[in-house]
C-alpha cells in the first residue's frame, strides 16, 4: 500500500510558468530506469542546472532559492504536466519531495498519473491561483495547509475549496494504488481462481 494522504502542511514554492510540460519536469535522457526512485535529482534538470550533468545549480531558478529549500507544495500555472504521457513526471516530483501541486488546470494524463503516485493535484480558479502567487511572493517561506478530507487549502487568512473525484479521494486517503485496490479483493480473486479448471490456472 502507498502512504495515506489526508492532510499536509508544507512550504510553498511558486513556479510562475504556464504549460510546463513533462519534458521540462523530467527530461527524456533520464527515463531509462523503471523504478520510481532517483528521479528527484533530475527534476526540472534543464532549468535547475546550468550544465547537462546537473552539477552546477542555476541561481536564477526558483527551486534553487534558499527560502524554498524543502518545499513540498508546488504552485504553478495552467496546463501543468502537458506533453508526452510519461509517469516519470509525478515520480520525479514526489521523489524530490512534493506532495501537492496547485494549478488552475492539468493535462489529463498527468492528472491521473498523479493520483496513482500519491501526488495531490489541486485545481483552483485562475483568480484564486493569482491570489496565491501574490501571497507567496509577498511572504516567502509561507506554508499552506492542504486538507484532502475537507477538500480545502488554507493559505494565510483565506480558505480555498477544491473538488476531487470521490473514488480518487478515497484511494489517496487510504493509500490505495492499483495494486492496493487489487489486494482488497484478494480473497474473491482466489475463490474465483479455485473454481476454474486446472488448465486455465
UniProtKB/Swiss-Prot annotation:
Alphabetized UniProt keyword annotations: Amino-acid biosynthesis, Branched-chain amino acid biosynthesis, Leucine biosynthesis, Lyase
Does the record bear Amino-acid biosynthesis in its keywords? Answer: yes
| Record-level GO BP terms | L-leucine biosynthetic process
Q: Which reaction is recorded as catalysed by this protein?
A: (2R,3S)-3-isopropylmalate = (2S)-2-isopropylmalate
Named in its record, the pathway it takes part in is: Amino-acid biosynthesis; L-leucine biosynthesis; L-leucine from 3-methyl-2-oxobutanoate: step 2/4
- Cite the InterPro entries for this sequence: 3-IsopropMal_deHydase_ssu, Aconitase/3IPM_dehydase_swvl, AconitaseA/IPMdHydase_ssu_swvl, IPMI_Swivel, LeuD
Q: Name one GO cellular component term.
A: 3-isopropylmalate dehydratase complex
What Pfam families is this protein classified in? Aconitase_C
Instruction: Supply the EC number(s).
Output: 4.2.1.33
Q: Which domain of life is it from?
A: Bacteria
For molecular function, the Gene Ontology terms on record are: 3-isopropylmalate dehydratase activity
Q: Which cysteines are joined by disulfide bonds?
A: none
Q: Which PANTHER family match?
A: 3-ISOPROPYLMALATE DEHYDRATASE SMALL SUBUNIT, 3-ISOPROPYLMALATE DEHYDRATASE SMALL SUBUNIT 2-RELATED-RELATED
> What does the annotation say about its assembly with partners?
Heterodimer of LeuC and LeuD.
Matching HAMAP family, A to Z?
LeuD_type1 (MF_01031)
- Give the family from UniProt: Belongs to the LeuD family. LeuD type 1 subfamily.
Main function: Catalyzes the isomerization between 2-isopropylmalate and 3-isopropylmalate, via the formation of 2-isopropylmaleate.
Name the UniProt record assigns to this protein:
3-isopropylmalate dehydratase small subunit
- Organism, by scientific name, is Escherichia coli O9:H4 (strain HS)
Amino acid at each position: 500500500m502507498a502512504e495515506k494522504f489526508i492532510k499536509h502542511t508544507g512550504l510553498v514554492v511558486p513556479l510562475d510558468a504556464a504549460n510546463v510540460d513533462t519534458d521540462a519536469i523530467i527530461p527524456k535522457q533520464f527515463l531509462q530506469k523503471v523504478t520510481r526512485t532517483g528521479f528527484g535529482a533530475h527534476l526540472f534538470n534543464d532549468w535547475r542546472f546550468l550544465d547537462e550533468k546537473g552539477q552546477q545549480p542555476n541561481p536564477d531558478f526558483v527551486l534553487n532559492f534558499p527560502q524554498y529549500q524543502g518545499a513540498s507544495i508546488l504552485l504553478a500555472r495552467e496546463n501543468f504536466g502537458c506533453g508526452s504521457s510519461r509517469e516519470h513526471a509525478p515520480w520525479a516530483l514526489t521523489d524530490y519531495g512534493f506532495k501537492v501541486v496547485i494549478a488552475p488546470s492539468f493535462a489529463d494524463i498527468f492528472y491521473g498519473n498523479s493520483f496513482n503516485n500519491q501526488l495531490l493535484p489541486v485545481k483552483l480558479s485562475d483568480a484564486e491561483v493569482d491570489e496565491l502567487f501574490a501571497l507567496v511572493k509577498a511572504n516567502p517561506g509561507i506554508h499552506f495547509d492542504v486538507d484532502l478530507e475537507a477538500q480545502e487549502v488554507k493559505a494565510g487568512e483565506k480558505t480555498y475549496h477544491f473538488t476531487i473525484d470521490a473514488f480518487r479521494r478515497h484511494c489517496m486517503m487510504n493509500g490505495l494504488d492499483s495494486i492496493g485496490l487489487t489486494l482488497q479483493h484478494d480473497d474473491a480473486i482466489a475463490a474465483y481462481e479455485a473454481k476454474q479448471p486446472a488448465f486455465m490456472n
